[in-house]
C-alpha cells in the first residue's frame, strides 16, 4: 500500500541511455508509489500506430524527435506519473525544459559495456543498426551524458542492483532530498 507521504511527490521522469533499464525500473517505481507508469517511446508508437524503426526510416530522426516533443509535452502535463523517456529525449531543448520544470528527473547512468549487453540483439533500436554498435553507444553517451546531467535532479548508477532495488533507491533519494 503506497504511503500518504508519496501523495506530495511530483512526477518522476527517468532519463538515460538505451539499455539503462528506465522502463523496467520505472514499472517498479510506479508500483511502489501506486502511480501510473508510461514509457514515452511506447506512447509514441501507440499514438502513431507505427513502430519507432518505421518512423526513423520514413521521417528520419528529426521527424521522430518532433513527435517525441509533442508527446512529452502532453505526458509531462499530467499528474501522478512515473515516465521512462527515450534515450535521445534530452537532445531537444524543449524536452529538457519540460522534464526539468515539471517533475523530478532521475538520470540512470549506465556504463557502455552494460548498455551493449542489454541492447545487443534488440532490432527495435534504429540508432544501433550499425556495423559497430559499441562505438555508437560510446559516441551517443559522450554527446548525451552532459545533457542527462544538466537536466537531472538525481543521478543513480545502474551497474549494481536489481531493478526493484534501484526503484527503492530512487525513492529513498527523492524523499531524503526534499525534491517534493
UniProtKB/Swiss-Prot annotation:
Subcellular location(s) of the protein: Cytoplasm
Biological processes, Gene Ontology terms: amino acid biosynthetic process; aromatic amino acid family biosynthetic process; chorismate biosynthetic process
Binding site for ATP: 19-24, 125
Residue positions binding Mg(2+): 23
Coiled-coil parts of chain: none
UniProt-annotated binding residues for substrate: 41, 65, 87, 144
Alphabetical UniProt keywords: Amino-acid biosynthesis, Aromatic amino acid biosynthesis, ATP-binding, Cytoplasm, Kinase, Magnesium, Metal-binding, Nucleotide-binding, Transferase
Reactions accelerated catalytically: shikimate + ATP = 3-phosphoshikimate + ADP + H(+)
Superkingdom as given in the UniProt entry: Bacteria
Cofactor note: Binds 1 Mg(2+) ion per subunit.
Pathways involved: Metabolic intermediate biosynthesis; chorismate biosynthesis; chorismate from D-erythrose 4-phosphate and phosphoenolpyruvate: step 5/7
GO cellular component annotations of the record: cytosol
Record function comment: Catalyzes the specific phosphorylation of the 3-hydroxyl group of shikimic acid using ATP as a cosubstrate.
Name this polypeptide is given: Shikimate kinase
Species of origin: Acinetobacter baylyi (strain ATCC 33305 / BD413 / ADP1)
Gene: aroK
Amino acid at each position: 500500500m503506497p504511503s500518504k507521504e508519496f501523495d506530495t511527490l511530483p512526477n518522476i521522469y527517468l532519463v538515460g541511455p538505451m539499455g539503462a533499464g528506465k522502463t523496467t525500473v520505472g514499472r517498479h517505481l510506479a508500483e511502489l508509489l501506486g502511480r501510473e507508469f508510461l514509457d514515452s517511446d511506447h506512447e509514441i508508437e501507440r499514438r502513431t500506430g507505427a513502430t519507432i524503426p518505421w518512423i526513423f526510416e520514413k521521417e528520419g530522426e528529426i521527424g521522430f524527435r518532433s513527435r517525441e516533443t509533442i508527446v512529452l509535452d502532453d505526458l509531462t502535463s499530467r499528474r501522478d506519473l512515473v515516465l521512462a523517456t527515450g534515450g535521445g529525449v534530452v537532445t531537444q531543448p524543449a524536452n529538457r525544459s519540460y522534464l526539468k520544470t515539471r517533475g523530478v528527473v532521475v538520470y540512470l547512468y549506465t556504463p557502455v559495456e552494460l548498455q551493449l549487453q542489454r541492447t545487443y540483439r534488440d532490432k527495435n533500436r534504429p540508432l544501433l543498426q550499425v556495423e559497430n554498435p559499441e562505438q555508437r553507444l560510446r559516441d551517443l553517451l559522450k554527446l548525451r551524458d552532459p545533457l542527462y546531467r544538466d537536466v537531472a535532479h538525481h543521478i543513480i548508477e545502474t551497474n549494481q542492483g536489481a531493478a526493484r532495488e534501484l526503484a527503492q533507491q530512487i525513492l529513498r533519494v527523492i524523499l531524503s532530498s526534499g525534491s517534493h
